[in-house]
């Protein structure tokens, strides 16, 4: 009996310790140290890329790369083995990372993140190729940011381009209070992403006024069971020019606008099946509880999907991307 009691005691201790460790890991993790980037030489480095290069792989501790005021004209890449980076700027007007490149979406991006577990705050990412004054260039893909890892939180940041601005390639991503500007497919990819309180700014009427209309989103999923989708909750659609809310980059595309404000830049038809023509039944394009001059759905495409209130709420909740509670462990100031 003593052996049994001793064995049971050990089991109880192991369970208690497991619960303690789990509870500890669920709390927000701390930043191990901060690297400062300053164009004027007042920090550890003068470029963002050199700061990232200084981090030894593989990295499993949160490291903040704090970037001071300035326009950093460089391409920045976070490689796969360098996760747990908190890229923080002074604000979208103060800290700008920009570059002038175009064509292939896999090489033109100003900013690319391959790693998992990334936090970004207070930075503008810009591809200037199509948005220079008096632009006479042909409009081509020119990516501002390419997000290719899992578990990203991006707050109070801006993405600026014209065609293919934000490549939300894959993974679970949470964007809050961000501004995304562009004219053609300016949020595109296969991602599983929630956009909260963001502004989608149509600029085709500024940089390419001869184009009749643009498109905000271009999404696709590889299969009906894939959990991906772009969900815009409490967002604002505004700008200059006319636009569709989205078009299907492929079958099974899923884009949901929930309780968002749609200005008159939105065309009455709203959506385009594009590469899923003939398979419209497989698309999940949804508008729920939206307001504004562009929110009238009476002339929308006939295959616009209708979901129940509970279904929409499920997509618009943080749980859509955060089933395992990863956001609560991120070192986010003020919470997500």
Swiss-Prot record:
- Where are the membrane-spanning stretches? none
Q: Which reaction does it catalyse?
A: [(1->4)-alpha-D-galacturonosyl methyl ester](n) + n H2O = [(1->4)-alpha-D-galacturonosyl](n) + n methanol + n H(+)
Site, Transition state stabilizer: residue positions:
163
Gene Ontology cellular component terms for the protein in this record:
extracellular region
Q: Supply one GO BP term.
A: pectin catabolic process
**Keyword Hydrolase (UniProt):** yes
Active site (record annotation): 164 (proton donor), 185 (nucleophile)
Where does it live in the cell?
Secreted, Cell wall
Protein known as: Probable pectinesterase 66
Annotated organism of origin: Arabidopsis thaliana (Mouse-ear cress)
């Amino acid at each position: 009996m003593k052996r049994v009691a001793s064995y049971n005691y050990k089991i109880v201790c192991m369970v208690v310790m497991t619960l303690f460790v789990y509870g500890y890991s669920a709390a927000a993790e701390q930043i191990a140290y901060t690297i400062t980037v300053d164009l004027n030489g007042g920090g550890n480095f003068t470029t963002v890329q050199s700061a990232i290069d200084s981090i030894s792989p593989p990295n499993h501790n949160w490291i903040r790369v704090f970037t001071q005021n300035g326009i950093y004209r460089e391409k920045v890449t976070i490689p796969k083995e360098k996760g747990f980076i908190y890229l923080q700027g002074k604000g979208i007007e103060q800290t700008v990372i920009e570059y002038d490149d175009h064509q292939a979406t896999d090489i033109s991006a100003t900013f690319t993140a391959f790693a998992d577990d990334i936090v970004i705050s207070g930075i503008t990412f810009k591809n200037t190729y199509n948005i220079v004054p008096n632009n006479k260039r042909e409009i081509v893909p020119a990516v501002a940011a390419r997000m290719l890892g899992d578990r990203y939180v991006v707050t109070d940041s801006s993405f600026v381009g014209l065609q293919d601005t934000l490549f939300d390639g894959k993974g679970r991503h949470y964007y809050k209070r961000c501004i995304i500007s562009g004219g053609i497919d300016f949020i595109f990819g296969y991602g599983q992403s929630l956009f909260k309180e963001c502004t989608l700014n149509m600029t085709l009427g500024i940089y390419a006024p001869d184009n009749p209309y643009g498109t905000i989103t271009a999404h696709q999923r590889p299969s009906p069971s894939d959990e991906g989708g772009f969900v815009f909750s409490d967002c604002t659609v505004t700008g200059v020019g006319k636009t569709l809310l989205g078009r299907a980059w492929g079958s099974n595309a899923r884009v949901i606008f929930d309780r968002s404000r749609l200005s008159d830049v939105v065309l009455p038809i709203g959506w385009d099946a594009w590469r899923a023509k003939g398979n419209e039944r497989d698309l999940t394009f949804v508008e729920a509880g939206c307001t504004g001059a562009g929110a009238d759905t009476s002339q929308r495409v006939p295959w616009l999907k209708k979901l129940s209130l509970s279904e929409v709420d499920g997509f618009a909740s943080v749980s859509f991307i955060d089933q395992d509670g990863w956001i609560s462990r991120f070192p986010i100031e003020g919470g997500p």
